[in-house]
Amino acid sequence: IDMEYASAAKAGIDVRFEAKATRLLTDDRGRVTGLLVRTPEGTETINAGAVVLAAGGFGGNPEMRTRYLGANWELARVRGTPYNTGDGIRMALDVGALPWGHWSGCHSVQWDLNAPWHGDRKVGDNFQKHSYPLGLMVNVKGERFVDEGADFRNYTYVKFGRTVIGQPRRTA
């Protein structure tokens, strides 16, 4: 990481820690001119010729998951990081950016009901986060709700994740 800091310093980029961006600033024409940040010392305005929003998606935000993915998604466990809260997306939308792309789709997989709410960021087999067991899947009512043999597992596991979350108690 030292090389990245050196490259940033050489390019005149100021790297800050404990500075949470809270709002994009714009001029009268709507061009982004900087941002507002919150630090332990208070709020600060940073003027900039360019702002890069590299803040991840909204997978760690239950409200945004429900808004864009649908019912029951606020209850989904997050396979990855809890820090992708959609703040960068929200800031862009707040200043007039247009949502573009496929917001109603996601990479969803079945996951152990007792797994942690967010990914443990360790590789291991404690909780299988990428698959489902071979066999029949039934919901809590004992009803079969998918054709487990519709295709190879690599082509069905994401599709089945969305199907499971629509079942009673989002459980199979």
Predicted regions and their residues:
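Conserved N-terminal/central alpha/beta ligand/cofactor-binding core
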Residues: 1-23, 63, 71, 135-144, ...
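Glycine-rich loop(s) and the adjacent beta-strand/alpha-helix scaffold that form part
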Residues: 38-39, 46-116, 156
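Fold-independent oxyanion-binding glycine-rich loops
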Residues: 18-20, 35-40, 49-50, 54-58, ...
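Helical element adjacent to the flavin cofactor pocket in flavoenzyme catalytic cores
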Residues: 1-49, 89, 95
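Generic detector of short alpha-helix boundary/capping microenvironments
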Residues: 39-40, 80, 123, 130
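An anion/pyrophosphate-binding glycine-rich loop and adjacent beta-alpha core
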Residues: 89-172
